[in-house]
Amino acid sequence: MTDNLTRAFKELLNQERFGSQNEIVDALKKQGFTGINQSKISRMLSKFGAVRTRNTKMEMVYCLPNELSVPNTSSPLKNLVLDVDHNSMLIVIKTTPGAAQLIARLLDSIGKSEGILGTIAGDDTIFVTPTNDKPIAELLQNIQRLFENAL
């Protein structure tokens, strides 16, 4: 197994959107890997301890255990953020496991000038409270733009 294949395989699983082994086979083939079949994917899933779990959309998908996919400061932000939602009072950001505090720290550093009063972060969820002078829709757009353009 090549390092490139291993890296691509792990990146696909970290996206948390592949529900079948055949979907993983197809995605790797689209990336140019040859000799990939369902049995090889099955062995790789076992080797890396992948499990099937529900993603934020409640779909059953393959993913790596938390300790293998711990985010770091060089991880692209858009890969760490799974969903951004809001109501009239606050914004809720869903992240990959372990990434919430890293992203909350970034948002706190942006601070009041961008309309962020403060954040509360757990393991994979962040609550963002806007300042009174910034409409929540505008803050939501700023946050989404930040994640789209980051790294």
From Swiss-Prot:
GO terms for biological process: L-arginine biosynthetic process; protein complex oligomerization; regulation of arginine biosynthetic process. Regulates arginine biosynthesis genes. Transmembrane segments: none annotated. Pfam families: Arg_repressor, Arg_repressor_C. Keywords: Amino-acid biosynthesis, Arginine biosynthesis, Cytoplasm, DNA-binding, Repressor, Transcription, Transcription regulation. It is found in: Cytoplasm. SUPFAM superfamilies: C-terminal domain of arginine repressor, Winged helix' DNA-binding domain. Its main location: cytoplasm. One of its GO terms (cellular component) is cytoplasm. Pathway: Amino-acid biosynthesis; L-arginine biosynthesis [regulation]. Belongs to the ArgR family. Coiled coil: none annotated. GO terms for molecular function: arginine binding; DNA binding; DNA-binding transcription factor activity. Gene3D superfamilies: 3.30.1360.40, Winged helix-like DNA-binding domain superfamily/Winged helix DNA-binding domain. It comes from the Bacteria. This is Arginine repressor. The keyword Membrane does not apply. The lineage of its organism: Bacteria, Pseudomonadati, Pseudomonadota, Gammaproteobacteria, Pasteurellales.
